[in-house]
Amino acid sequence: MKKVSVIAAAVAATLAAGSAFAVDFNGYFRAGTGISGNGNADQAVNKAGTGRLGNENDNYYEFGFAEELKTGEQTWKVESMIAQGNSGANGWEDGDFNVAQFNVQAKGLLASDQEAVMWAGKRYYQRKDIHITDFYFLNTSGTGGGIENLSVGNQKLSVALVQDGDNTNSSGYIFDARLANIGLWENASLELAMAYNFATEKDSKNEVADDGVLVSAILHQGLSNGFNQTVFQYGTAGYGAQAANFWGAGSYYARGTEAFNDASGFRLLNWGVINLGENWEMGHQLAYLAGSDIGGQFGGDGANKNTYTGKSFDIDQYSVVVRPMYKWNDTMRTVFEAGYNAGEKISNGGLATEDFGNAKFTVAQAWAMGDSFWARPELRVYGTYLLDTENDKAFGDDDTEFVVGIQVEAWW
């Protein structure tokens, strides 16, 4: 009886505390499965370049708790998040749970600027992404600290230092600086960002990778029927290789190799979502990416098998993705998505020129909690046609594949 009483008291205390603490439960997940024509279960190809709808063959989950604690004019936010991903092939799967976020953000500490926020810990730091391709084009997340939303006239300045990797020779870091809310014309604003990735060498060690710089300009245009965003990014060294590919940009800088020291690259992106009438909405991505002296070939035997050969390549590619959606009512919609990504790796120093390309077309019948393009949760059944334009054996013995599947996506 005593044990029951203790449990009952704990439950009662928890329920009573609910009125005193406003804990925010938030998260995101996607999960589903598909059947492909070649019998290899679900298939997915290059979603950053051709679109993610009907083109994801994994499950991914993240859930977090956050609470704001107020004292006087100050607000202290404690934020946490756990993330995990797997293939979804079995009902019970082993997988590492990652502490994606655990940080404290304090607003109101500066009497001269009550909106400025000081923070420290592990954090998704002001990430920038294109939703329909799941492409994070600026992402310097990690463990660190900084201050954000400092008032500089009408603009907002944010600076941060974030650790980015550690190896036997060095420890990597990102210095991130951003200036946002730069007013232009009506409903238009500009954000400028600079990420400098550098390393500190350990005693008697030498880091062969050069530091890199990534600069970004993000133009946001509000429209009467939606929004449009244009992004230009330029990177050097390891950031040059990232900018020339759909690899994201910010963290996971290439250390321990000189392969990218001479690299430079840029990308031009345009994306947005617009309302095309009472029943239609459409999202899109347009992208052009290019780079030169991208390290491309490693060789050697034994302990030298990963030695950079000095042979590299130039690269250019483009991507077009459109996702129109027809709304039958407040819940049911039919969603189409077509995408094409193609380019070439141009020989430099003896490598052969290599063309590459993928195309995808998806039709999905979906039901969502609301009629907006962004309404979630959303249940989908879909059919997807995949094409590899350069590899005749991309899908078993064929260059095409068809997948039918079901998926749910939610955020809250």
Swiss-Prot record:
Membrane topology of the entry: Multi-pass membrane protein
Main subcellular localisation: membrane
Site feature (Greasy slide, important in sugar transport) residues: Y28, Y60, W92, F227, W374, W411
Subcellular location field: Cell outer membrane
CDD domains: Maltoporin-like
Alphabetic keyword roster: Cell outer membrane, Ion transport, Membrane, Porin, Signal, Sugar transport, Transmembrane, Transmembrane beta strand, Transport
MF terms (GO), sorted A to Z: carbohydrate transmembrane transporter activity; maltodextrin transmembrane transporter activity; maltose transporting porin activity; porin activity
Pfam families, alphabetized: LamB
UniProt-listed InterPro entries: G_neg_Bact_CarbUptk_Porin, Maltoporin, Porin_LamB, Porin_LamB_sf
Keyword Nucleotidyltransferase recorded: no
GO cellular component: cell outer membrane; pore complex
GO BP annotations, alphabetical order: monoatomic ion transport; polysaccharide transport
Catalytic activity field: beta-maltose(in) = beta-maltose(out)
Signal peptide: 1-22
Induction comment: By maltose.
UniProt site positions, description: Important in sugar transport: Y136
Subunit structure: Homotrimer formed of three 18-stranded antiparallel beta-barrels, containing three independent channels.
Its biological purpose: Involved in the transport of maltose and maltodextrins.
Homology family: Belongs to the porin LamB (TC 1.B.3) family.
Name of the protein in question: Maltoporin
Native source species: Vibrio cholerae serotype O1 (strain ATCC 39315 / El Tor Inaba N16961)
